[in-house]
């Protein structure tokens, strides 16, 4: 049993629903309320999951300029050049790191890696993990820069 690999958990369903909505809104120009209504009607989501996903969706959309500012400060690759799923998962991850008091740094990073693995495969997991962990380390400095740039916290 010593060689047994740990079981891979599936992506969190509430976060997956939120990321799918964000993808449709930001990449396919869908209406947020229609996309959210569709994805949050999933019978696998309970009321708590729906509330979390909704807060993540609309919190991320409401703070998108600041989120993109933060991502632009730590990524060597321009946001527009990233794979659309990578860009969306990163935005949701930053939404959790910077704006959700109920999500810890390890949870935001780990669940974002699980999401990108599920949505785009293994190739982007290291990039997503690295960007989010760097943001977590530099959060105090970055929030000061965002305020100086006139962006809301």
Q: Residue locations for each model-derived region?
A:
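Class I Rossmann-like S-adenosyl-L-methionine
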Residues: 1-153
């Amino acid at each position: 049993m010593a060689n047994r690999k740990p079981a891979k958990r599936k992506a969190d369903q509430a976060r997956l629903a939120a990321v799918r909505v964000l993808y449709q809104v930001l990449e396919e120009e869908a209406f947020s309320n229609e996309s959210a209504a569709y994805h949050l009607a999933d019978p696998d989501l309970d009321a708590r999951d729906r509330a979390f996903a909704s807060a993540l969706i609309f919190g991320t959309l409401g703070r998108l300029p600041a989120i993109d500012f933060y991502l632009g400060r730590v990524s060597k690759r321009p946001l527009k050049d990233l794979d659309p799923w990578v860009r969306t998962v990163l935005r949701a991850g930053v939404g959790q790191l910077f704006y959700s008091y109920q999500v810890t740094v390890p949870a935001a990073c780990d669940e974002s890696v699980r999401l990108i693995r599920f949505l785009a495969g293994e190739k982007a997991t290291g990039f997503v993990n690295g960007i989010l962990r760097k943001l977590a380390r530099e959060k105090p400095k970055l929030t000061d820069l965002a305020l100086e740039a006139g962006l809301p916290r």
